Amino acid sequence: LCELEQYISKLAEKSDDKKPNKRDTFRNFVLNNFDENHKLFTLTAPTGYGKTLTALNFALKFNKSRIIYALPFTSIIDQTYDIVAKIYKNSDILVSKAHHKTTIDEKNLTEEDRYSKIKFLMESFSGEINITTLYQLIFALFGNKNKDNVKFNQLKNSVVIIDEAQAIPL
């Protein structure tokens, strides 16, 4: 939580406008209305209001084992991962990304490691913050393969964020 708040503060410092902006107002409203007794939330705001970081900030307040951040498009997953990984690069928080185009840089891995730790983290939602596709989340809930069962078990004591839910094909 601390790293994220520092990142958000740095963004505000870089802004030419020193008065509270729409993002600050939106984030403060969301965070001030946090109620851990509720289990389901919706977050709706126009583009540019900082929903991604606000949702992550909100999810961190629950103090659960992990966050599963599901998005519909690989481009948004990559963009979100880049931001979140940058925020937590100097911390012990493990941020993982998994979609069908995710690759592992295997040139520095031993044969033993090639299909162990990194691949397991990518495919199992075992990081503290896991950024993935809506399809991976759906497979975790309804899949019938062993790797889906591993993901399903990781949903316990987790906060699940479904971003751009309107993009789910029904």
Report residues per predicted region.
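N-terminal helicase ATP-binding lobe
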Residues: 1-170
